[in-house]
């Protein structure tokens, strides 16, 4: 069985790790980086770029370069968070037929799981290149506060990428695994994981206990905000720069898509620089132009100014921390360690705020960019049965229930319940002779069902006529280890039953997923063909260059007929190189190599003659008689064959 890899599918950056024995290994991608930007670009010729190459061309292709797709995954178009992003993103967010938020690129509608699958495919390929074998199984992380629809959509993304997702695991829990596994401390420890990433914020309170030599990680509570992260910090800087530039130059950059893309890049860079320095220059020449000519942008940004711009965002992370502590039934002083995860936690003001709330210095021995992927790889090893000394007990982040009479939310499973779990409750009809009941499943903490997130609905039909309150309908909620919900309803009188796996009443259908999987496989085949064509071209161009160089140096030694033959073969190959026909390029390359054989022999003969002349001259100079007799002793009488590489 192959390895189960661990993937941190991040809003801004993604990371992949594996276990080698008892050691974890974060794998470098093809560019040599340990994290990959979660950016996907769709080129005019149909090529899809992922990671650093997509990021590099974003300024010139903003409408077809998708970033932060994770903020849209499993979300409805009408949700206020999505509506807010529509005005900020340079690409088009559109409403799918099922009401989900999708993205439109080059006239084609794409689902967020389909876009995220491109990043997962890059992570899969990174692991395969390193391991030298196919990878088909993965543990993928999600924010702890992701709801059922978002978890399901992430799992779908894995399937589209050709991965069997063995487990969806919460990011803070994964970070705790990475932190706690190598700690030798005996006794129980309570840790707080503060995870502020590119697009989401989570906090989890986790107890690490030693139980008979086994490390037990039990999540006591979790809380967060799935629409708060580094992207929002960048936006505050962008808004500030736009305002300052408008004051100085009287030009509004907010409607200029190309300028916005450059501003985004500059804002991210400035934010990172200000974690280590007190001031930075944002310098963007030729940012725009008007009737008076080109305009240049040069603005100084201090750390103090940045902190004042984002103070309210940092403050927003504290309320979930307070709730998580309360839900865990402990006080702040009970926390032994605070772990920071996510790139945004490098910001000094964030660290200061965390220290102020928890009353202790956060740990510095956890890599905020890599800990989550490492934890996912550890969980992969546990699931494959190679590791027996770890037990992970996670929780469901939000309450789950059904709508009952009067639109009330009747909670079946409360938030922070350890998963997997199962719960059944008996309900009855609300009217006389009611032939069917509709079970509407919601997720959230509000008392009125409609104020929560509707996950799905189904009917149980064929209930025999009876007065209200008589039929006995048993509703069962079953949450699996991925945090994904399965709901069943059974009429106890007739034994009639109906079950569904909650796939948000929108989400991707099985047919859509299968189609996307096929498209992805076709893309992979196309990519392979493109690569083979590039390699054939490179080989052909190298042959043309070598033969032309040799002709200019030794062509005069050839008969006119031989020289013309080689020149004709060069022309044929040059013509083939302009086409997309790999077979023709290969054929003409072979023909040129065959035609230029005589030229090679002439060059070889000339070189040998020159060496012989040099040797004779040297021998004459040295008196030459002593070594003459033995001059053939070192020549081996054998033929050397060219080994053709396949």
UniProtKB/Swiss-Prot annotation:
Belongs to the heat shock protein 70 family. It comes from Acidovorax ebreus (strain TPSY) (Diaphorobacter sp. (strain TPSY)). It comes from the Bacteria. Induction: By stress conditions e.g. heat shock. Acts as a chaperone. It holds the Pfam family HSP70. This is Chaperone protein DnaK. Keywords: ATP-binding, Chaperone, Nucleotide-binding, Phosphoprotein, Stress response. The keyword Membrane does not apply. The lineage of its organism: Bacteria, Pseudomonadati, Pseudomonadota, Betaproteobacteria, Burkholderiales.
